[in-house]
Amino acid sequence: MSELAFGAGPLSRAAATVHNLLVVEALLVATTLPGLVALLLDRTVSNLPLVALCALPVGPALSAALYALHHRGSDLTELRPAAAFLRGYRLNARGALLVWAFWLGWITVLAVNLANLGAAGLPGWWVAPSLLVGAAATEWMLNALVITSLFAFRFRDVARLAAYLVIRTPGVSLGNCCLVVVVLGGVLASSEAVVALAGSVLVLALLHNSRRLIAVVRKEFTR
């Protein structure tokens, strides 16, 4: 009977996953500290641009977390999640910031317009298309963040691929939609801080849901 090597059993793999998640969570919190300032602001429309500015570091941090968890090891003797996170941050910070800032800009403008619907002279039916645009932009952002975190493409190529894959991989889009609903539900039921503490688990869920997207990009758009 063959014996399992140390660190190769199911308990060891579970322990490795927990270790990876805890380390990545700690690094996520550390690299998004400026964003915590937004939690101290009043929830008023006038503060939305400042909230968006505080949230800018979140994009590169999420990208680094995606990179680290994608390259995570399951062997207890070969766990280096911190090194993978820092490498992902260094490689992808610029691309992730472009994706994140572009999305934040769209969402901030939409949120301000919706909050000032009457003052802006917009009709009530404007809410529905605005929400659809916001949902589509969020689907695009999640795809773009995964692509720019795991592949080396130019921003314009990432933007086009992300939009194309929203339609090409409907299962991924539906899963991402459910993930966004979970996040919004968590924020409404508790607070942004509680959701942030589950950041690494949510990133792992996004990565798991994006397996089909990653496979399509690797097979059809890389050599």
What residues fall within each predicted segment?
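Helix-coil boundary and N-terminal low-complexity module in membrane systems
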Residues: 1-111, 122-124, 140-142, 147-180, ...
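Membrane-interface helix-capping segments at transmembrane helix termini in multi-pass transporters
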Residues: 114-128
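Small-residue-enriched core segments of transmembrane alpha-helices in multipass membrane transport
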Residues: 130-135, 202
